[in-house]
């Protein structure tokens, strides 16, 4: 399996009593209709670590109903140990998801041997297409490219690597060492066009929650060799990414980035996103006004 194009890491709409599944269904429907290659509800942007296993499975059931046969349905584990990872993977498999994205172990800064052992324990029990993942913001460490190479050499179900490190030298190593065998996928909107230009196969990105077809247009321009136009569109979005979060997903407002994506999605799509799930904080009026101005400058609202 080769994953190419844009998989959208969707935000999770909440109601007072839990996940707003109808809101999620509406969002997924719009994204699929726009032509994106995949959807990924149980993502970091989707606040996966704050969802119960039941909520995660239900979200993936909705995604399968909406996108099945029209776009890849990708499920994220959001777990930090091998037993929970295997359990949620089996439940996702029963739903019929297309690809499993495995969150690396977090909370403790593990060495490469521990991470390698984690992958072996999981992949010995999980037989479905898998994307490996590095996200130092959440784990406190970056996974050596050589670990991904070892795992991919041993397990044929590994089909890709998602890189949310923000380290472009590291990303180039992934492309150089693994790009002929695996799909190398950029995890940060800010680096999507530069990654494509250097040979990445696509991205797993949150921007399309509210950008409409803009991210697809970036992908098309690069694939058609229209580099100057792709770079111009990339630069047009830079003020937004500087505000919302760029390399490392921190940006101006620190840990509020998932909330920003939800607020932007509600502004553009008109779908009630509800509040972020605690302890994620809301944004204040000043930040809301700045976000609104940036979206207006782009003609999105």
Curated annotation (Swiss-Prot):
Keywords on record: Cytoplasm, Lyase, Schiff base
Localization (cell): Cytoplasm
The UniProt record lists the keyword Membrane: no
Main location per the UniProt record: cytoplasm
Keyword Lyase: yes
SUPFAM superfamilies: Aldolase
Active-site residues per Swiss-Prot or TrEMBL entry: 44 (charge relay system), 107 (charge relay system), 133 (proton donor), 162 (schiff-base intermediate with substrate)
Enzyme class: lyase
InterPro entries reported in the protein's UniProt record: Aldolase_TIM, DapA-like
Quaternary assembly: Homotetramer.
Similarity annotation: Belongs to the DapA family.
Protein name (record): Uncharacterized DapA-like lyase Tneu_1812
Origin species: Pyrobaculum neutrophilum (strain DSM 2338 / JCM 9278 / NBRC 100436 / V24Sta)
Encoding gene per record: dapAL
């Amino acid at each position: 399996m080769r994953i190419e194009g844009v998989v959208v890491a969707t935000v999770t709409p909440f109601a007072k009593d839990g996940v707003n599944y109808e809101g999620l269904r509406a969002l997924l429907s719009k994204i699929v209709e726009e032509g994106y290659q995949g959807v990924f509800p149980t993502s970091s942007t989707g606040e996966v670590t704050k969802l119960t296993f039941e909520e995660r499975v239900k979200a993936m059931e909705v995604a399968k109903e909406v996108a099945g046969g029209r776009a890849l349905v990708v499920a994220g584990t959001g777990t930090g140990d091998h037993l929970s990872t295997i359990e949620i993977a089996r439940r996702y498999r029963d739903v019929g998801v297309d690809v499993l994205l495995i969150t690396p172990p977090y909370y403790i800064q593990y060495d490469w041997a521990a991470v390698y052992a984690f992958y072996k324990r999981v992949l010995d029990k999980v037989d479905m297409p898998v994307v490996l993942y590095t996200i130092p913001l959440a784990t406190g460490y970056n996974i050596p490219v050589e670990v991904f190479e070892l795992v991919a050499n041993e397990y044929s179900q590994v089909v890709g690597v998602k890189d949310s490190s923000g380290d472009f030298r590291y990303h180039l190593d992934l492309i150089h060492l693994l790009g002929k065998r695996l799909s190398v996928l950029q995890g940060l909107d800010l680096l999507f066009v530069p990654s494509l230009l250097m040979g990445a196969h696509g991205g797993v990105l949150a921007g399309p929650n509210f950008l409409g077809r803009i991210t697809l247009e970036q992908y098309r321009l690069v694939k058609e060799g229209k580099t100057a136009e792709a770079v111009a569109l990339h630069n047009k979005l830079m003020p937004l990414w500087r505000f919302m979060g760029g390399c490392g997903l921190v940006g101006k407002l620190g840990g509020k980035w998932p909330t920003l994506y939800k607020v932007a999605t509600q502004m553009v799509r008109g779908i009630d996103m509800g509040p972020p799930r605690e302890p994620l904080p809301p944004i204040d009026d000043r930040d809301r006004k700045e976000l609104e101005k940036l979206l207006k400058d782009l003609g999105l609202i």
